[in-house]
Amino acid sequence: MTTLSTLNKFKKDGTKFTCLTCYDAMFARMMEKAQIDTILIGDSLGMVVQGHDSTLPVTVDDMAYHTANIARSNKQALILADLPFMSYVTLPEAVVNSRKLMQAGAHVIKIEGGCELCELITTLAQAGTPTCVHLGLTPQSVNVFGGYKVQGRGNEAGQKLLDDAKAVVDAGAALLVLECVPAELAKAVTEAVAVPVIGIGAGADTDGQVLVMHDMLGMVHGRAPRFIHDFLTDERNTEHSIEGAFALYQQSVKEGSFPTEQHQFS
């Protein structure tokens, strides 16, 4: 079974690892067969499962339901679960909501933000709840950003993101996710912190990669993000199957053939 210790060893050894979003039992079992290292029950389910335009309507109960689906069905992957929008504004509600997701079967709680999360991160760590901090393009802040845009460009913005990464790790964060940031910045963050860093649209130098499952299967509504690749129709997927797509993703990340320069930002 993959644990945080496994991911830390991967980072130390320079071994890349995989993460995919997942929301139901059948796909969770397929990912177990493909040996996907980590699974994220993302609040992205609001868009790809529930049909919303953003992640904002997702509730803690939604997240707990889908987390339990995965925990019952995949016994090998490390399971990360998102705390959804406005569910961790105050420390007491954050603790209560984190407990709900951990009791549903999550191993790590994912939250979005920077140094303002440090007190929460430390509190959860002391209570035995590991956190993964999502930096860069944080979808719960889409209205603040004015849309889905690359973050961390320019010296000032890049330094702020690097400082936030160091601060949350110092506070006790066990993992980081970097989304849609320049590849050079992602590399700098990965080298600067001791914990594993997972990238999405952040270049090839992060310790691991994550994609939304629907995206990597070519199930995209509207314009496809630059950082995705359709592993279902890839000619290397000789089975032309979903299981084959998961296995090809695992292989491609491990061997370093995904992502490439075409999937990253400068």
From Swiss-Prot:
Catalytic activity from the UniProt record: 3-methyl-2-oxobutanoate + (6R)-5,10-methylene-5,6,7,8-tetrahydrofolate + H2O = 2-dehydropantoate + (6S)-5,6,7,8-tetrahydrofolate
GO cellular component, one term: cytoplasm
Signal peptide: none
EC number(s) recorded for this UniProt protein: 2.1.2.11
Superkingdom in the source lineage: Bacteria
GO biological process: pantothenate biosynthetic process
Molecular-function GO terms, alphabetical: 3-methyl-2-oxobutanoate hydroxymethyltransferase activity; magnesium ion binding
Pathway listed: Cofactor biosynthesis; (R)-pantothenate biosynthesis; (R)-pantoate from 3-methyl-2-oxobutanoate: step 1/2
Pfam family, one: Pantoate_transf
Cofactor(s) named in the record: Mg(2+)
Residues the record lists as binding 3-methyl-2-oxobutanoate: D43, S44, D82, K110
Location of this chain's protein in the cell: Cytoplasm
Alphabetized UniProt keyword annotations: Cytoplasm, Magnesium, Metal-binding, Pantothenate biosynthesis, Transferase
Cofactor note: Binds 1 Mg(2+) ion per subunit.
Main localization (coarse): cytoplasm
Record: residues binding Mg(2+): D43, D82, E112
InterPro entries per the UniProt record, alphabetical: Pantoate_hydroxy_MeTrfase (IPR003700), Pyrv/PenolPyrv_kinase-like_dom (IPR015813), Pyrv_kinase-like_dom_sf (IPR040442)
Active site: E179 (proton acceptor)
Subunit structure: Homodecamer; pentamer of dimers.
Function: Catalyzes the reversible reaction in which hydroxymethyl group from 5,10-methylenetetrahydrofolate is transferred onto alpha-ketoisovalerate to form ketopantoate.
HAMAP family named among the record's database cross-references: PanB (MF_00156)
Similarity comment text for this entry: Belongs to the PanB family.
Protein name per its UniProtKB record: 3-methyl-2-oxobutanoate hydroxymethyltransferase
Organism placement in taxonomy: Bacteria, Pseudomonadati, Pseudomonadota, Gammaproteobacteria, Moraxellales
